[in-house]
């Protein structure tokens, strides 16, 4: 019996959990990882250690793979086009992926197709920033590196002209955006297959702490049904217009005046979709596997009225395993997902999921477990 081989570029926790989702289907994974200690490299049997930025390494890795996918968006698109020319399906393809790699390209395309975004402009020096601010509501202005930023990195909130020079010292292109007056952050997660089948998960609320996702609530509490539907349709439109294959996460601002604006795109499984592992009929990881293999997509509906995901960040309590006894005894329904990473302060090392009919109870259980695992809660 022959099953396809999925080539996964990137060895982080997203690759690890995508691999886990493929196991029940008998799907084989081949992994290109930076080091043998990476999260996914600990669990995938066929691992190649190498540099994803090297075309020769990518070509050697792709031999024997039926399709290539990713757990990050950083692979050079020219290299991916070379793989496609070699006859290897790449999903999502480079023409789609560039919109998750380059914020300037993303903003231009979304504006072209009529998707609402914050006011923005590519800027080359502090004078451009001052001019951009003057044309709008003034300072503060948000500056972002066009490529490479994540979890709050590569983002500056500039309160005046005297701060506008800081982002340019790195010598990389910068995008200026208005500072959006938003009430909360949302995320719309969708999955699309090569032949165009698409499914949408419920829109979630994503709560950030110091620029890093802390808590996700599914579905987003008290979100007007019209706005929720608009967010889902917006994400499905983006996936179709950009030709996305696989999972697409659309990070959104819900503004104080009732609008929804696109913040960022991610073309891979996403932190805002981790709740689906235990809270949806088909997880984001399982549907990503199905999509890249062009299998029929699974049901994205939730299993419970409420699901909460809370990230477990590294703290001063390195022996997290010893915390399992308390967490599991206190909450037999708790789902713990650890990534096999060394515990370092502030590092994402796992997450917990809880679900139920009472939102306050679901959130309390998830936050208690995550805090106890980290060591910030001791009783």
For each predicted feature, which ranges?
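Active-site nucleotide/adenylate-binding loops and adjacent lid/helix of ATP-dependent enzymes
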Residues: 97-187, 191-238, 370
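Short acidic-glycine loop/turn motifs at beta-strand connectors
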Residues: 192-197, 255-258, 356-358
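Active-site "cap" helix and flanking loop/linker of ATP-utilizing ligase/carboxylase catalytic domains
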Residues: 229-250, 256, 266-315
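Peripheral (often C-terminal) accessory segments that flank ATP-dependent C-N-forming ligase machineries
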Residues: 290-379
């Amino acid at each position: 019996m022959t099953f396809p081989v999925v080539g996964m570029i990137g060895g982080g926790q997203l690759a690890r959990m995508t691999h886990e989702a493929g196991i029940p289907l008998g799907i084989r994974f081949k992994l290109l990882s930076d080091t043998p200690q990476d999260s996914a490299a600990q669990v995938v049997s066929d691992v190649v250690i190498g540099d994803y930025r090297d075309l020769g390494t990518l070509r050697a890795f792709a031999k024997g793979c039926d399709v290539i996918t990713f757990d990050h968006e950083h692979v050079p698109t020219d290299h991916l086009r070379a793989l496609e020319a070699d006859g290897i399906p790449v999903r999502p393809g480079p023409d789609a992926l560039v919109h998750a790699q380059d914020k300037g390209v993303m903003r231009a395309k979304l504006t072209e197709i009529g998707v609402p975004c914050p006011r923005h402009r590519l800027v080359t020096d502090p004078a451009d920033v001052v001019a951009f601010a003057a044309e709008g509501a003034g300072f503060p202005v948000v500056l972002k590196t066009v490529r490479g930023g994540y979890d709050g990195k590569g983002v500056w909130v500039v309160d005046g002209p005297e701060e506008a020079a800081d982002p340019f010292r790195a010598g990389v292109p910068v995008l200026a955006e208005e500072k959006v007056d938003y009430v909360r952050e949302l995320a719309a997660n969708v999955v699309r297959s090569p032949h165009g089948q698409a499914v949408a998960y419920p829109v979630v609320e994503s709560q950030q702490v110091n620029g890093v996702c802390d808590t996700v609530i599914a579905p987003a509490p008290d979100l007007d049904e019209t706005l929720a539907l608009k967010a889902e349709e917006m994400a499905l439109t983006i996936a179709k217009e950009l030709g996305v294959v696989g999972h697409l996460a659309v990070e959104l601002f819900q503004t104080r005046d009732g609008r929804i604006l696109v913040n960022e795109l991610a073309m891979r499984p996403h932190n805002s979709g981790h709740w689906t592992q235990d809270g949806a009929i088909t997880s984001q990881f399982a549907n990503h596997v199905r999509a890249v293999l062009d299998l029929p997509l699974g049901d994205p509906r939730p299993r419970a009225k409420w699901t909460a995901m809370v990230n477990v960040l590294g703290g001063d309590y390195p022996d997290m395993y010893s915390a399992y006894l308390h967490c599991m005894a206190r909450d037999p329904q708790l789902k713990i997902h650890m990534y096999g990473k060394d515990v370092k302060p502030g590092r994402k090392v796992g997450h917990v999921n809880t679900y139920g009919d009472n939102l306050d109870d679901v959130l309390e259980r998830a936050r208690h477990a995550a805090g106890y695992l980290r060591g910030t809660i001791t009783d």
